[in-house]
Design a protein with these regions (language model features):
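Helix-loop junctions on the cytosolic side of multi-pass membrane transporters
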Residues: 14, 18, 56, 60-89, ...
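A single, central transmembrane helix in multi-pass transporters
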Residues: 54-61, 99-159
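Hydrophobic transmembrane alpha-helices of Major Facilitator Superfamily
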Residues: 3-11, 119-124, 191-192, 204-212
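Juxtamembrane intracellular "pre-TM" segments in multi-pass secondary transporters
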Residues: 79-111
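C-terminal transmembrane bundle of multi-pass solute transporters/carriers
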Residues: 132-282
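Residue-level signal for discrete positions within transmembrane alpha-helices
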Residues: 37, 41-45, 118, 152, ...
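Hydrophobic alpha-helical segments of secondary membrane carriers
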Residues: 31-39, 113, 232-236
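Cytoplasmic helix-loop-helix junction between adjacent transmembrane helices
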Residues: 1-38
Length: 282
């Protein structure tokens, strides 16, 4: 299931890059992220109800049925995109993709830059807080659900207020804002209801940051290699998410959750500085 979802996502983002360029591409990325955020929040709410009322098997059957509906819808869509024709073998295509990235350093820099969004995959932090801090105030499942829902709502509405002000020249300020918002959340985590507000602020800039850095990569990549570059980018992005989760798990046994959160926020300051160093090449 996860392999299929990953393959679909890479194909989808490659297709968007072939259909659109520049600002329209960034807006398409934002719309995609908004839809994802809505379904993420809505899915959590529905899945909890289904699992509690009908069991796990029913949830899996419904999940598979949703994929079937999506397949029926996509079959009927006619995308006006010229199919790539190649006689190279798959391993040669993979090798050529890595050679292309190696010979175009800016692509490598942008892949690394986009990975900063993976730092916001701090679901483990929310779970730890719910089990250790919030269980005295509210049930653990409800604490996790409300925390994720608060961030998901912000992910949906953030681009409406922020994206029109973000440009290539001031993107680093958005990264700094993301860092400060995460640090703010770290300071107010002990109060569940205030932390919901802080999580909302954290989510406001994440969607725009994700879509803008993704658009930078898509716009700077040759169409011939866009599919492979997007796939490698997703691999690196997932690595960033995994490393963030491992970091949280390791540090949770060494220090407090608020310190971990603050360290994650500081990482965005480092990425903001890094972006200012590579901006002249973009």
């Amino acid at each position: 299931r996860m392999s299929a979802a990953s393959m679909f996502f890479s194909t989808e983002m490659s297709l968007l890059a072939k259909l659109l360029r520049g600002k329209p591409l960034q807006m398409a990325n934002e719309i995609h992220s908004i839809i994802w955020s809505f379904t993420y929040a809505f899915g959590m709410a529905i899945s909890g109800f289904v699992v509690n009322s009908y069991g796990i098997k029913a949830a899996f059957v419904i999940d598979a049925f949703i994929f079937f509906i999506a397949l029926v819808i996509f079959i009927k869509i006619d995308f006006v995109v010229k199919a790539s024709i190649t006689s190279d073998k798959i391993f040669q295509l993979i090798k050529d993709g890595f050679i292309y990235i190696k010979s175009n350093k800016i692509i490598l820099h942008l892949i690394f830059l986009h990975s900063c969004v993976g730092i916001t995959s701090f679901d483990a932090l929310i779970t730890i807080l719910a089990k250790n801090e919030y269980k005295y105030i509210i049930s653990v499942p409800l604490a996790i659900g409300l925390s994720n829902a608060s961030r998901a709502v912000a992910l949906m509405f953030g681009p409406v207020f922020i994206s029109k002000y973000v440009t290539k020249e001031n993107l680093h300020y958005l990264m700094i804002f993301q860092g400060f918002s995460i640090i703010l959340w770290g300071f107010v985590q002990n109060d569940f209801y205030i932390s919901l507000i802080a999580l909302f602020i954290v989510g406001l800039s994440t969607t725009t940051l994700w879509s803008f850095t993704y658009a930078l990569l898509q716009n700077n990549c040759d169409e011939k290699y866009i599919g492979r570059v997007i796939s490698y980018n997703d691999m690196f992005f997932m690595l960033s998410c995994v490393l963030t989760t491992l970091f949280i798990g390791l540090m949770a046994s060494l220090t407090s959750v608020d310190i971990i959160t603050i360290l994650l926020g500081v990482c965005f300051f480092a990425f903001a500085f890094y972006y200012t160093r590579i901006l002249k090449w973009i």
